């Protein structure tokens, strides 16, 4: 069996194995939307090892920023897309790859299972009504499944409290392609909103984001940073990975400003200072 995975196989056998792996993924997880480039890219990364979060994330530097990549089907499917990413799909992709590498799993089917667990409530089958649309819900659900852990101490720098009050999706239905096409789903989305409304979480206000020993102890390289917002009806405005440079904390993210995945040249403090609607950060650790 070792000879069959040594990379010395004839091309036709490698192709046969790859097709079998893709078929297995579809059979196990129902409808999965992906290209051959995506599936082979996943397997290549899984086989290469090197499971540090930032090492995996940096493989995607330069990948184009594209929004709404999960809305490409009339009905919800598990979408795997390594060619185009928004801030959330970038984080989910990296996290699913990391979990597979940490477990020694090297198949596309294993990756699809990990991604589904991260993206949908309780790891449910792909269903728009079960997708973790709000990042507070995403963090709570993934913490409950042992995927990430909230970081909310010490105080300082976690000096502020966010009280969640979301309704943006149900009050802006026309902004969401699939929800607009399925108005009967609105009550289910409202239930998701109600699950987190009223909850309180400690966070670091942007005034506390400084290049200090304390902050370096509280926020680690590869932590997931959720940038909070004061936009009515929303909890989170942007997400990415924490990266420490000599001059302070930076964000590795799929950027709509730069139109690609970048390691933001500005410090996070400078970045937040340019956006009045951004109030601070919450942190979770893979």
Where are these regions (language model features)?
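Boundary at the C-terminal end of the N-terminal hydrophobic targeting segment
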Residues: 28-32
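Short, well-ordered loop/turn sites that connect or cap secondary structure elements
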Residues: 218-219
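Acidic/His-rich structured neighborhood in mature extracellular/periplasmic domains
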Residues: 65-202, 244, 253-256
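C-terminal soluble interaction/assembly domains
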Residues: 223-286
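Short alpha-helix capping/helix-loop boundary micro-motifs
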Residues: 204-215
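Bacterial N-terminal signal peptides that target proteins for export
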Residues: 2-17
């Amino acid at each position: 069996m070792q000879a069959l995975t040594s990379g010395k196989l004839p091309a036709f056998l490698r192709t046969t194995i790859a097709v079998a792996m893709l078929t297995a993924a579809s059979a196990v997880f129902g409808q999965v939307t992906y290209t051959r480039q995506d599936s082979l890219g996943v397997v290549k990364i899984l086989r290469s090892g090197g499971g540090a979060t930032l090492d995996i994330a940096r493989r995607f530097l330069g990948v184009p920023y594209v929004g709404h990549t999960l809305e490409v089907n009339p009905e919800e499917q598990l979408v795997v897309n390594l060619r185009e990413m928004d801030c959330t799909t970038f984080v989910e992709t990296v996290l699913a790859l990391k979990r597979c590498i940490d477990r020694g799993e090297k198949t596309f089917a294993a990756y699809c299972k990990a991604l589904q667990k991260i993206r949908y409530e309780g790891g449910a089958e792909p269903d728009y009504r079960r997708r973790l649309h709000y990042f507070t819900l995403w963090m709570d659900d993934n913490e409950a499944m042992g995927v990430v852990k909230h970081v909310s101490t010490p105080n300082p720098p976690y000096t502020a409290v966010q009280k969640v009050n979301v309704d943006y999706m149900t009050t802006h239905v026309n902004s969401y392609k699939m929800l607009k096409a399925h108005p009967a789903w609105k009550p289910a989305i409202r239930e998701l909103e109600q699950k987190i409304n009223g909850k309180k979480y400690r966070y670091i206000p942007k005034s506390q984001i400084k290049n200090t020993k304390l902050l370096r102890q509280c926020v680690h390289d590869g932590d997931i940073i959720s940038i909070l917002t004061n936009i009515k009806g929303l909890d989170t405005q942007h997400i990415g990975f924490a990266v420490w440079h000599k001059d302070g904390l930076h964000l590795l993210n799929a950027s709509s400003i730069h139109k690609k995945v970048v390691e933001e040249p500005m410090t996070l403090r400078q970045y937040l200072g340019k956006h009045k609607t951004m109030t601070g950060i919450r942190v979770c650790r893979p």
